[in-house]
Amino acid sequence: MTEAVAAEATETAPATDDRRGGRRGERGDRGQGRGDRGGRGGRDGGREAEKSQFVERVVTINRVAKVVKGGRRFSFTALVVVGDGNGMVGVGYGKAKEVPAAIAKGVEEAKKSFFRVPRVGSTIPHRVQGEAAAGVVLLRPASAGTGVIAGGPVRAVLECVGIHDILSKSLGSSNAINIVHATVAALKQLEEPASVAARRGLPLDEVAPAALVRALQNQKAGV
């Protein structure tokens, strides 16, 4: 009688182990399934791809206060420049209770104000001067290899545009907001040499210098 009971226990033990092993295997399979879903990384992939398309520069962040009956309420403002590095740029100004939220608002506003900047190679077609309030900025074309000769606010705008060789000088206010808007005003004055020649009814070589004409030809040829 005792031997029969022992034999039955021996036969049922592997079945119990198999059931436990099966449950563990199912749990492992579920864990793999969760890993395949990718979690939050999969959902945020689109946002990261969108960010990589643009060049963002935070020019300045200020803390401002509003005086109310109960005291002062503090918030932050952010001046942001956004561009694609290929001739498109915009400037935005965001305000929020936290710095990241203010920057995000500035980025969204900058994307809504995009405009195209004419370029010749890695510089600008001609000299321009922009003004905004007390800010005055002078931009001059430069030969290849010169680099961006500019201060912080002006440099931020030019880098977002994708200009790599240029000379600049700030002649007015040192306020970063005025300088950025003066730089944008200067860039909006730029014109394509071909459109200037067509408006005047003259050939391109009579409107633009020989070096500029060669640069335009090389740009069309993809050199």
Curated annotation (Swiss-Prot):
Q: Where is the composition biased (Low complexity)?
A: 1-15
GO biological process: any one?
translation
Q: Does the keyword Chloroplast apply?
A: no
GO CC terms for this protein?
small ribosomal subunit
Q: Which SUPFAM superfamilies match?
A: dsRNA-binding domain-like, Ribosomal protein S5 domain 2-like
* Regions of compositional bias (Basic and acidic residues) in chain numbering: 16-51
Could you list this entry's UniProt keywords, alphabetically sorted: Ribonucleoprotein, Ribosomal protein, RNA-binding, rRNA-binding
Highest taxon of the source? Answer: Bacteria
Stretches for region Disordered: 1-51
- Which Gene3D superfamilies does the UniProt entry name for this protein? 3.30.160.20, 3.30.230.10
| Protein family membership | Belongs to the universal ribosomal protein uS5 family.
Known role: With S4 and S12 plays an important role in translational accuracy. Located at the back of the 30S subunit body where it stabilizes the conformation of the head with respect to the body.
Q: How does it assemble?
A: Part of the 30S ribosomal subunit. Contacts proteins S4 and S8.
Q: What is known of its domains?
A: The N-terminal domain interacts with the head of the 30S subunit; the C-terminal domain interacts with the body and contacts protein S4. The interaction surface between S4 and S5 is involved in control of translational fidelity.
Question: This chain belongs to which protein, by name?
Answer: Small ribosomal subunit protein uS5
Q: Which organism is it from?
A: Paenarthrobacter aurescens (strain TC1)
Q: What is the lineage of its organism?
A: Bacteria, Bacillati, Actinomycetota, Actinomycetes, Micrococcales
